[in-house]
Amino acid sequence: MARYQYEPFAYVTPPELAGGTSSSAPVIIVGAGPIGLAAAVDLATHGVASIVVDDNNVVSVGSRAICWAKRSLEIFDRLGIGDRMLEKGVTWKLGRVYRGDEEVYNFDLLPEDGHKFPAFINLQQYYVEQYLVERCADFPGLIDLRFKNRVLSISQDETGVAAEIETPDGAYTLRGDYLLACDGANSRIRRQFGLDFEGRHFEERFLIADVEMQADFPSERWFWFTPTFHPGQSALLHKQPDNIYRIDLQLGPDADPEEEKKPENVIPRIEKVVGGRPFKLDWVSVYSFNCRRIDRFVHDRVIFVGDSAHVVSPFGARGGNGGMHDVDNLCWKLALVVGGEATDELLESYNQERIHGADENISNSSWTSRFMSPEPGVEMAFRNAALSLA
């Protein structure tokens, strides 16, 4: 089965530089990842125009976010791509937890039948972004996608927002009523505002590898504590479309990311997981993670959405799904404000409600992360005692 083929999106000279025409939109969206694109589509369904700018011109490289929960799938369905995601994605609801080679626990996330969408599907982020870009084309008068448009700085006053944009053809100023910062965990806009994440940083490092192979593994989530193929650490296996499998391996806090990403170090580790099955490396990364958020998500006319506002560990699939909940909460409210049917005070409810949602995700994600990679002492003793009783 063919792997995903990365094709660059076309760069088009902005009208501001092509003929001196000044453009503006009710909403400027910075970031053409899943959250920014979903926000553009959601606003368009409410009749609100947006201009989306991104400094790249290709979908995300590597699978990145893969686990999309039932509620997020329902939101994607409302936005018009739910069926495509369901058709392509790997459906799953069962998870198994092992200690060594022994199964100690299993769970069913959606035991009853009759639902349109499953508990989860696994679908690589690049497919989600591709589907959303194609969906944006259904709103030619409402969504303007501008790739290779890099935000240098933003300013705001009581009348609107101005973004200074750099392109291959030069720089220009883009104006709007509101700006959504959907530019991810390393948000340039958040840094410009001097906003710090508050919460916990986890020093533990993990190897993440997407491998292409033929295997008869069921469509389940498998997690190991101290497996025989990776002693003293933890491991995770997920099936994805195109015969791609996600493998996460705990490395320890002192692992050198650049060394661990080298094929000569990755391949022997993967061989121990998959046995004698032949495989090809599709994507490799090494990461540590945070469970943190900024103090406020709404800063006058600049609104932070998704990873620019809050980040969690990848365990529990609360990152991309949490961002989709932000979109679902915000866009109808922003449409009412832009349309003059509500005041800015309505946006404060987004701030309060999604901070509550982020705090819940951060709490659960932090607990899961501490259980998976406990500190020596009390945390480790608790984890081992819990596993021994399972």
Q: Over which residues does each language-model region extend?
A:
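Core beta-strand elements of the Rossmann-like FAD/NAD(P) dinucleotide-binding domain
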Residues: 23-25, 168-178
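Conserved mid-domain beta->alpha element of the FAD-binding
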Residues: 32-47, 53, 132, 181, ...
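Conserved FAD-binding catalytic core of PHBH/FMO-like flavoproteins
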Residues: 103, 133-134, 143, 172, ...
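Catalytic cores of secreted or luminal carbohydrate-active enzymes
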Residues: 375-390
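Active-site-adjacent segment of FAD-dependent monooxygenases/related oxidoreductases
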Residues: 61-139
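A conserved short coil-to-beta-strand element within the FAD-binding core of flavoproteins
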Residues: 147-161, 285-286
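Extreme N-terminal leader/targeting segments of oxidoreductases
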Residues: 1-27, 42-46
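Residues in the short beta-alpha loop(s) of Rossmann-like NAD(P)-binding domains
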Residues: 56
